[in-house]
């Protein structure tokens, strides 16, 4: 099976969409995702003629070992033949760590199928479940690979019958998850059925693997596996790898069970496209039409030291060529594609064009970020929709300040931070204008540790960091009366009340169902049906800011209000960025403008007059409505031997946590709990100590919750002191002068 291909050969395969498969490998940490993709790359990665000369003597992987790096391509293309027909299989990199938001990882959006890797000994873990759920929500078809089967023989010393029982139990567990999370029409069709061949058993490290049909065809039994490992003879294991090579088993299963892009887009576009399904663009995507308008979903932005920013994404419709003018829907920018390339193995090779259904790499889209939708420029003003609105549910909750160890490295550090924040949209980089500090905010302690490690490893920048600071939000618990906000010149008056948004409204905005720019009648209908709003009031929502605060214009017939509305809304957004308690962002506030008196002369009603008027009225209302701070909570998922449950529960309660659920599986307990992020900094070492190092756990952002009243004042004072604010809390009168 020659893998040495010219770009033309690969392109001609890509043009026949029935010969393309887009897949990803998803797994819990350490279950063998990297080993699996490395094994596939070594055995089936397409090698271009240029690389072939060098690569004949050296496998890709040994090239990597010589350079001492792991080639982390956003995509790797593989080649496999079945019955004389060649196929291109795009293996798309999915991030190894759970995207803490539980929000669907962007890379799943461009897959049609996933290989779910499970460790034969550890079984289905939290993350396996999270990622499987996410892929089913995106209508990505799973196939199963039970890896490390050798551990069942070497460590657990099981007999062939016991091995089969253990594997069947695992398949049942995966099928239960599919039954739970898949939509009705896929529940049965996508179940794992060994006799059909959509599950592979094997060892990626030892390079062997088979499905039931392959085992029958080649006459391999589980007793052969047991014998190969029990004998202690390495050549027996190698012989197994020659008889049933893992890459053949996996790629054959992928070609057979994962749909081609055209078949997949028919049922996936209605689920993942957030625009009108009757539009030309949606129809072209549903048919994966290479002659339709260009639609590209960008799933990955990487910084290439030689080429600059490389956008990798899937062409859902049209054909991408260099020189095309395209429109970035979320960034609202026009950009020009300077160069188009395709992936061969892990390397990028220049191409004239990439047709619909395939994965492309493009240069020139430096304003794009992962999650962006790029469309043909002629749809610039058509409000076509996109694959994803730009906010992530998991807002950054922990901040540290960073400075370079060596002051000479300041510019290098700034550049590295900018590149990191492009590659990871959940990482926020800010400069504190007053102190000149560089602040780095992330989804949790672990997330920041990983980012600092990348700074050092990828960019060679050593930094000194401050102790972590937890990010809070300010909010209120009751409704205020109407307050008058005056402008400094006393010529403009705004009459405003505030009240807390209910949980349903917050959820609808957080998950992107309600967006600022949607049709007001549609918004009002959803809010009335799902969040108890009054329809007429909901129609008057004129702004929603990034921290989930809403501005309602309930006035009627106020002179000159139209001309200054934009300024008032700008004032509202600014006020929401720093609340009165501790200058932390405000969250979950409904601001209602009831009436206004606006000066007729534009010179007397500019931002300098209206910003303070808006802010004063909002803050006066805020301080009378039982103000509070919200703190971020983390969800913990812990697996620990039963003997240590008491100790572990003790750690959780000591940290103001609460246990939500506890189940027992054999001798292992699975504990789900919530703890405040502010209490989580020493968590890892304490859990290890409490369980003699035998607890496994994962964390993800859970929700915002009010700080307990007994701690509230203390927390506010500490934040004020850190920010250099006066000790006295502001009073209502301060805003009514």
Curated annotation (Swiss-Prot):
Keywords of the record: Cytoplasm, Elongation factor, GTP-binding, Nucleotide-binding, Protein biosynthesis
Recorded GO MF terms: GTP binding; GTPase activity; translation elongation factor activity
UniProt-annotated location(s): Cytoplasm
Disulfide bonds: none
InterPro entries, sorted: EFG_II (IPR041095), EFG_III/V (IPR035647), EFG_V-like (IPR000640), EFTu-like_2 (IPR004161), G_TR_CS (IPR031157), P-loop_NTPase (IPR027417), Ribosomal_Su5_D2-typ_SF (IPR020568), Ribsml_uS5_D2-typ_fold_subgr (IPR014721)
Range of residues in the leader sequence: none
Modified residues (Diphthamide): 604
The keyword Chaperone is assigned to this record: no
Binding positions (GTP): 27-34, 93-97, 147-150
GO CC annotation, single: cytosol
Key word Ubl conjugation present: no
Pfam families tied to this protein: EFG_C, EFG_III, EFG_IV, GTP_EFTU, GTP_EFTU_D2
Domain tr-type G: 18-262
Chief location: cytoplasm
The family this protein is said to belong to: Belongs to the TRAFAC class translation factor GTPase superfamily. Classic translation factor GTPase family. EF-G/EF-2 subfamily.
HAMAP family noted in UniProt: EF_G_EF_2_A (MF_00054_A)
Stored NCBIfam families: aEF-2, small_GTP
Role noted for this protein: Catalyzes the GTP-dependent ribosomal translocation step during translation elongation. During this step, the ribosome changes from the pre-translocational (PRE) to the post-translocational (POST) state as the newly formed A-site-bound peptidyl-tRNA and P-site-bound deacylated tRNA move to the P and E sites, respectively. Catalyzes the coordinated movement of the two tRNA molecules, the mRNA and conformational changes in the ribosome.
Protein name: Elongation factor 2
Source taxonomy: Archaea, Thermoproteota, Thermoprotei, Sulfolobales, Sulfolobaceae
Gene: fusA
